[in-house]
Curated annotation (Swiss-Prot):
It comes from the Bacteria. This is Photosystem I P700 chlorophyll a apoprotein A1. PSI electron transfer chain: 5 chlorophyll a, 1 chlorophyll a', 2 phylloquinones and 3 4Fe-4S clusters. PSI core antenna: 90 chlorophyll a, 22 carotenoids, 3 phospholipids and 1 galactolipid. P700 is a chlorophyll a/chlorophyll a' dimer, A0 is one or more chlorophyll a, A1 is one or both phylloquinones and FX is a shared 4Fe-4S iron-sulfur center. Coiled coil: none annotated. PANTHER family: OUTER MEMBRANE PROTEIN, OMPA-RELATED (PTHR30128), PHOTOSYSTEM I P700 CHLOROPHYLL A APOPROTEIN A1-RELATED (PTHR30128:SF19). It comes from Thermosynechococcus vestitus (strain NIES-2133 / IAM M-273 / BP-1). PROSITE patterns: PHOTOSYSTEM_I_PSAAB. It is found in: Cellular thylakoid membrane. Phylloquinone binds at W697. The gene is psaA.
Length: 755
């Protein structure tokens, strides 16, 4: 009798669990179901605070890394759903309440508006005349310019896109549920970094850029070419016609073969010159629109796509070829770094806080870089001459960057407290940084003191000399010059270098560094930004505030686990008010407290940056251009002589430019006047939480409870004063909200009036 061997089944790695967590609305309806203590319900009013503090702190729900990973993954889909709903709302406003088509016909004469206020009790005053007979609120998001660059020519297309956004949101909500409750990935899937890198680089960034490049070439470029030539939007063929009908493209770009297969042959045979009509290397700005050449940006996205698709094939997965991240990290040893990056692979695959800290620091820095590039090289048509939008985009990306960087430090400190394992990090870079943290922090402290006294001292000197009537003894372009020679050298270098490094480019990347004035519709789009003593001085204020922010945040991370004062700090957790009773002088030392203090300095820092930008641009860049080429700036170049004293900043910037928001009542800008007042109030309200003692409120509450008891209306849930940390959290939140909204109202009322 012969026994046949069992059929060999191909081995398949199972990377999901089926139906791991039941879908229970009954469970979700119970507040605090994720925490045993909270689930019992409220005994005191502290319960509602803890409910909010812990709802998304998945580390406290379970210690199982796989379950935590799944919750984070699922939450990402929920976040994306919210983003799609929000974007859909933006597009819907563009479709239903905007003057987009009128703006498209006359982008220099008509202002963008996508919101019309209902006149319930006289709010109709807010609907200002934005041109072309349309009355609404002027928007400063830059969406109109983005839509034009995308090739959107009518409001129906916006409507369709808005519906598409809702469909995507629904898909994301489904995915978030499906990947937690039905098919949940195993931990090894989350830790498979090579596969993740390949997919994110080649798929998300590579194919994403390729898809956008394809859209730009086949839809954006032909439509924008026709718009620039003065063809009415309603006479331009619809996007799909350019894709399906090659003869339309052949009319606009005759020297290219637009055949379905023959069109891509030059790409793979390296005959790239065939595409030079629409994949250009012009450099500089399009003189018609004041934006980057869309043919340059299409070229850029195609190049980026090629690079990232290659990058997405570099990491070792199923075929045993390519890089292994663990090997790269463990081989990375410098002459002074001991065991180098050994152990970091384990850190970054088991601590999502460590991963998030790096990502937040990188994304925050990137957002700040985006802010700088948006005005120097405006990417969309007619963006550069829309001054309110330019100011808003700069301010927005600076604030976002600041918050993300602080978030990076916050999660760095949480990683140190919750996830750091000293035994796994022996003499590697992380361990060595922690061992010489005193040297790092004391040096940083010295730098902060030096920068603070010297930068502020220059201003104090100038205020004093001006008060004494001795202008020749002031630091200024006409007195004692402190020219930013290195910055001027960099500007000059960047103006000249492309001639050698990019000989085929027609112009340098940005005229901010040097070149001719680019004017659109009689307004300055961009021109060389001349730097002088005033810029040198405020630059050192920037250096000072950045270094203080870094000092606070880095100290919080490096001393999160222990310090000479509290050697066992790691046992107290990420946030604790004091190590007491019985140990004086140990308050405000937790990782959380450093984030709290860091937020205030981040706010200081970004405020000075956006004030500098706003005034510098109004003084030296933005303005009107006469037919003979003379430029009249909004504030007539007063930055160089006024921004060199503290009094100048107070009088000629804050006070002089606040006149529009203060005098906005009775005009379409009156909402900004109300916001200006209201946000000051919110800011002042924050001080009540920041300068208060917990015991004071607890005593007050107890006497109020006594009165309620007398009247037999005592509450079942015992009222409690906010804890020290809750009070600080409420305080810093209102401080930032009030400060940012005040700045927003101040900036917009000003720039909409004069821009």
């Amino acid at each position: 009798m012969t026994i046949s061997p069992p059929e060999r089944e191909p081995k398949v790695r199972v990377v999901v669990d089926n139906d791991p967590v039941p879908t229970s609305f009954e469970k979700w309806a119970k507040p605090g179901h994720f925490d045993r203590t909270l689930a019992r319900g409220p005994q005191t009013t502290t319960w509602i605070w803890n409910l909010h503090a812990l709802a998304h702190d998945f580390d406290t729900h379970t210690s199982d890394l796989e379950d935590i990973s799944r919750k984070i993954f699922s939450a990402h889909f929920g976040h994306l759903a919210v983003v799609f709903i929000w974007l859909s709302g933006m597009y819907f406003h563009g479709a239903k309440f905007s003057n987009y088509e009128a703006w498209l016909a006359d982008p220099t004469g008509i202002k963008p508006s996508a919101q019309v206020v209902w006149p319930i009790v006289g709010q109709g005053i807010l609907n200002g005349d934005v041109g072309g007979g349309f009355h609404g609120i002027q928007i400063t998001s830059g969406l109109f310019q983005l839509w034009r660059a995308s090739g959107i020519t009518n409001e129906f297309q916006l409507y369709c896109t808005a519906i598409g956004g809702l469909v995507m949101a629904g898909l994301m909500l489904f995915a978030g549920w499906f990947h937690y409750h039905k098919r949940a990935p195993k931990l090894e899937w989350f830790q498979n970094v090579e596969s993740m890198l390949n997919h994110h680089l080649a798929g998300l960034l590579g194919l994403g850029s390729l898809a956008w490049a394809g859209h730009q070439i086949h839809v954006s470029l032909p439509i924008n070419k026709l718009l620039d030539a003065g063809v009415a939007a309603k006479d331009i063929p619809l996007p799909h016609e350019f894709i399906l009908n090659p003869s339309l493209m052949a009319e606009l770009y005759p020297k290219v073969d637009w055949g379905f297969f023959s069109g891509v042959i030059p790409f793979f045979t390296f005959n790239w010159a065939a595409y030079s009509d629409f994949l250009t290397f012009n450099g500089g700005l399009n003189p018609v629109t004041g934006g980057l050449w869309l043919s340059d940006t299409a070229h850029h996205h195609l190049a980026i796509a090629v690079l990232f698709i290659i990058a997405g094939h570099m990491y070792r997965t199923n075929w045993g070829i390519g890089h292994s991240l663990k090997e790269i990290l463990e081989a990375h040893k410098g002459p002074f770094t001991g065991a180098g990056h050994k152990g970091l692979y384990e850190v970054l695959t088991t601590s999502w806080h460590a991963q998030l800290a790096i990502n937040l620091a990188m994304m925050g820095s990137l957002s700040i870089i985006v802010a700088q590039h948006m005005y120097a090289m405006p990417p969309y048509p007619y963006l550069a001459t829309d001054y309110p939008t330019q100011l808003s985009l700069f301010t927005h990306h600076m604030w976002i960057g600041g918050f993300l960087v602080v978030g990076g430090a916050a999660h760095g400190a949480i990683f140190m407290v919750r996830d750091y394992d000293p035994a796994m990090n022996q003499n590697n870079v992380l361990d060595r940084v922690l061992r010489h943290r005193d040297a790092i922090i004391s040096h940083l402290n010295w730098v902060c003191i030096f920068l603070g006294f010297h930068s502020f001292g220059l201003y104090v000197h100038n205020d004093t000399m001006r008060a004494f009537g001795r202008p020749q003894d002031m630091f200024s372009d006409t007195g004692i010059q402190l020219q930013p020679v290195f910055a001027q050298w960099v500007q000059n270098l960047h103006t000249l270098a492309p001639g050698g490094t990019a000989p085929n480019a027609a112009a340098t990347a940005s005229v901010a560094f040097g070149g001719d004035v680019v004017a659109v519709g009689g307004k300055v789009a961009m021109m060389p930004i001349v730097l002088g003593t005033a810029d040198f001085m405020v630059h050192h204020i920037h250096a000072f505030t950045i270094h203080v922010t870094v000092l606070i945040l880095l100290k919080g991370v490096l001393f999160a686990r222990s310090s000479r004062l509290i050697p066992d700090k790691a046992n107290l957790g990420f946030r604790f008010p004091c190590d007491g009773p019985g140990r004086g002088g140990t308050c405000q030392v937790s990782g959380w407290d450093h984030v709290f203090l860091g937020l205030f300095w981040m706010y200081n820092c970004i405020s000075v940056v956006i004030f500098h930008f706003s005034w510098k641009m109004q003084s030296d860049v933005w303005g009107t251009v006469a037919p003979d080429g003379t430029v009249s700036h909004i504030t007539g170049g007063n930055f160089a002589q006024s921004a060199i004293t503290i009094n100048g900043w107070l009088r000629d910037f804050l006070w002089a430019q606040a006149s529009q928001v203060i005098g906005s009542y009775g005009s379409a800008l009156s909402a900004y006047g109300l916001l200006f007042l209201g946000a000051h109030f919110i800011w002042a309200f924050s001080l009540m939480f920041l300068f208060s003692g917990r015991g004071y409120w607890q005593e007050l509450i107890e006497s109020i409870v006594w009165a309620h008891n007398k009247l037999k209306v005592a509450p079942a849930i015992q009222p409690r004063a906010l804890s020290i940390i809750q009070g600080r959290a409420v305080g810093v939140a209102h401080y930032l909200l009030g400060g940012i909204a005040t700045t927003w109202a101040f900036f917009l009322a000003r720039i909409i009036s004069v821009g």
